[in-house]
Curated annotation (Swiss-Prot):
Gene3D superfamilies assigned: 3.30.230.80, 3.40.50.11260, Heat shock protein 90, C-terminal domain
Name of the gene this protein is made from: HSP90B2P
Biased composition (Acidic residues): 354-367
Protein name listed in UniProt: Putative endoplasmin-like protein
Organism: Homo sapiens
Pfam families reported in the protein's UniProt record: HSP90 (PF00183)
Alphabetic keyword roster: Chaperone, Isopeptide bond, Stress response, Ubl conjugation
GO biological process per UniProt: protein folding
Family stated for the protein in its record: Belongs to the heat shock protein 90 family.
Region annotation Disordered: where it falls in the sequence: 350-399
Keyword Transferase assigned: no
An example Gene Ontology CC term for this record: mitochondrial inner membrane
Biased composition range(s): Basic and acidic residues: 368-399
Taxonomy of the source species: Eukaryota, Metazoa, Chordata, Craniata, Vertebrata
Biological function: Putative molecular chaperone.
Cross-link Glycyl lysine isopeptide (Lys-Gly) (interchain with G-Cter in SUMO2): residue positions: 130
Length: 399
């Protein structure tokens, strides 16, 4: 009697658990026959958990999770290139009739048919991962193997577009959940042509993990949309003539303040000062230049515990000063503009503009400091600021 689909799936699960010596069902499994230049059969599967020591000596350690058979005779599992480094968690067997039983392992490593097998294994593996149900993918696969996908985007140029579709991020749309780049693009506002990384009512993707910023730097665009890191200068959400004219008018109105900040208040600590187009609630922000390190990247580089020395590139990026952006809609900024027009040497304004090193006592947050300055300068309540932020967002939506 013909087996049911469920019975076949149960047999595959039993095989995978026996093969990997694990008690949990695999996250995904695929059984296929490849034909063409070389014919072979294969069963591949994704384990439930990251194999122990997966990232020990990453890239230099051979993977023994793929076992090669020739006409049902075991040949070897001593491979370095059966699967790319980022897919070294995939387990399974390959049985080919197109290889010789007498071939040595050394010769096999250079065999041209092995390269064909590898290419097809990668294609089938990515196809298998893409078909994992969203809930299982987000809750199980991404938590265990998300780092592998990000490393793949960095290292595997030929499959980068496919791997980008498998990336997941936290975003401002639903902070408790994770989202794909495809979902982010679908939710884009009209006229938005860039994916925001880090807001004026725009969904922002959070780069919270060390590897993920390298990953995005290796990915020029997704679905025709380039990435825009809002922790860097030059963020624009709308390039329409109406928006340009509006911003130019604001820049002209506030011109004395950025000039005063750059030339007098904190001239030795910043590269330049400018009027922001994206701040809505914060009164100001320090952002990196287009080719500089973001604050997150700086923390990553400073945390390199085994760094043996700094190269020319590292020293160059580490020494670059930040750009100081001000929010022209914030009551405190408006009051600063009024005060410096009256007296450029106003002690209160000078004190407010000083950029200090990070506090040794983190209990006093930036928000606490801002509230203290509000009281000192007798500027806007929280309700007034919120109303200003709402008006700012409404203005952008209209544009």
């Amino acid at each position: 009697m013909a087996e049911t689909i469920q019975e076949v799936e149960d047999e595959y699960k039993a095989f995978c658990k026996s093969f990997s010596k694990e008690s949990d069902d695999p996250v995904a499994c695929i059984h296929f026959t490849a034909e063409g230049e070389v014919t072979f059969k294969s069963i591949l599967f994704v384990p439930t958990f990251v194999p122990r020591g997966l990232f020990d000596e990453y890239g230099s350690k051979k993977s023994d999770y793929i076992k090669l058979y020739v006409r049902c005779v075991f040949i070897t599992d001593d491979f370095r290139d059966t699967m790319p480094k980022n897919l070294n968690f995939v387990k399974g067997v390959v049985d080919s009739g197109g290889l010789s039983l007498n071939v040595s392992c050394e010769t096999l490593q250079q065999h041209k048919l092995l390269k064909v097998i590898r290419k097809k294994l990668v294609h089938k593996t990515l196809d298998m991962i893409k078909k994992i149900a969203d809930e299982k993918y987000n809750d199980t696969f991404w938590k265990e193997f998300g780092t592998n996908i990000k490393l793949g985007v960095i290292e595997d140029h030929s499959n980068r577009t496919c791997l980008a579709k498998l990336l997941r991020f936290q975003s401002s749309h639903h902070p408790a959940d994770i989202t794909s780049l495809h979902q982010d693009v679908e939710r884009m506002k009209e006229k938005q042509d860039k994916i925001c990384l880090m807001a004026g009512g725009y969904e922002v993707i959070y780069l919270t993990e060390p590897v993920v910023e390298y990953c995005i730097q290796a990915l020029p665009e997704f679905d025709g949309k380039r990435f825009q890191n809002v922790a860097k200068e030059g963020v624009k959400f709308d390039d329409s003539e109406k928006t340009k004219e509006s911003h130019e008018a604001v820049e002209k109105e506030f011109e004395p303040l950025p000039n005063w900040v750059k030339d007098k208040a904190i001239k030795d600590k910043i590269e330049k000062a400018m009027v922001s187009q994206c701040l809505t609630e914060s009164l100001c922000a320090l952002v990196a230049s287009q080719y500089g390190w973001s604050g997150n990247m700086e923390r990553i580089m400073k945390a390199q515990a085994y760094q043996t020395g700094k190269g020319i590139s590292t020293n160059y990026h580490a020494s670059r000063k930040k750009t100081f952006e001000i929010n022209p809609r914030h009551p405190l900024i408006r009051d600063m503009l009024r005060r410096i027009k009256e007296d450029e040497d106003d002690k209160t304004v000078l004190d407010l503009a000083v950029v200090e090193e990070p506090d040794e006592e983190p209990e006093e947050t930036a928000e606490d400091k801002e509230q203290d300055k509000d009281k000192e300068m007798d500027v806007g309540t929280d309700e007034e600021k919120q109303e200003t932020a709402k008006e700012s967002t409404a203005e952008k939506d209209e544009l």
